[in-house]
Amino acid sequence: MALELALFARFGLEVELNREVGWATIRDKIIYGELDAAHAPAGTAIAATLGLGCIPTPCVTGLVLNLHGNAVTLSEQLWRDGVRDGGTLRELIGTRAEPMTFGVAFQFSSHNFLLRCWLRANGIDPDRDVRLVVIPPAQMFANLEAGHLDGYCVGEPWNSLAVLSRRGWCVAASEDIARNHPEKVLMVREDFAEERAPEHVALVAALLEACRFCDQPENRERVIETLALPEYVNAPIHALRMSMCGSFDFGHGRIEKYPDFNVFSRNGANEPDARKAAWVLDMMERSGVLPDRSLISASTVQRIFRTDIYDSARTLLAARGASI
């Protein structure tokens, strides 16, 4: 939305947006300098800095882009088999000789963390009772439809596509699993943040203003129409609308009010503070992708989650005044 609203230009920036296939590709392109900045899962900056699954590359974030936005989707076949919630899923798993397969978008993303939390809360061991596989978000629904997955945890609109097609149904929304969890951040290399500090702060300021725009209910239709365009999410408008207008359709007649399904600005969403960093680290440790918490010191966490950059961007935005 920052590009569509000319917010980058307002802050003197020329920005080119690139769509990428998956989160690992985005991480690698940041590491090797093919991208200057990226919309990325909150755990990615920590993982890149520590060299978890990649070359160690110090990265930072000065902006959390949103909270929540995900759901756990199960296949329609599981519904036909009698699954209605986590408890009945656990019972069915106990009768199967082969483990069920569930998709997550990235090893270091909230989707992996949230699905594991939901499974554990329902007495299902994510490492022994089921099989978790990494699949790019846009390919989740196709794999569910083809029968390769029994379920997945992913962001919208990939859950709503399953509901609309009656190939799947949602059993949980992410805010019910971990209230106010950080979702995506703006990720850059540390050397970019240092060497091009004025540009970086301006970038954060432009995106912060865009986040505020997206959070206003009266702007949601414009956001939906923009996301539906081929160069962006390229998904049906009705699928995008299902989670963006204050309610959420879980499927099979269950429609509930969810005003906080997507939070882009309110509730202190945008500050990359210590609480959000701690949640990500806790989830990384619990999921096993961070083998030893002592690998990362408190000072390193502060170098990654940069409230100083966020504060500078807020000051710049306040000085310029809102334009939308």
Predicted regions and their residues:
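Inter-helical turn/loop segments and adjacent helix faces that build the functional surface
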Residues: 125-130, 194-199
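Secondary-structure end/capping motifs
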Residues: 197-304
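A bilobed periplasmic-binding-protein/Venus flytrap-type ligand-binding module shared by bacterial periplasmic
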Residues: 70-82, 181-198, 213
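Short, glycine-/small- and polar/acidic-enriched structural segments
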Residues: 1-127, 133, 150-160, 167-180
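C-terminal non-catalytic accessory extensions
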Residues: 307-324
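Short, conserved secondary-structure transition motifs
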Residues: 136-142
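Short gly/pro-enriched beta-turn/loop segments at secondary-structure junctions
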Residues: 180-181, 222
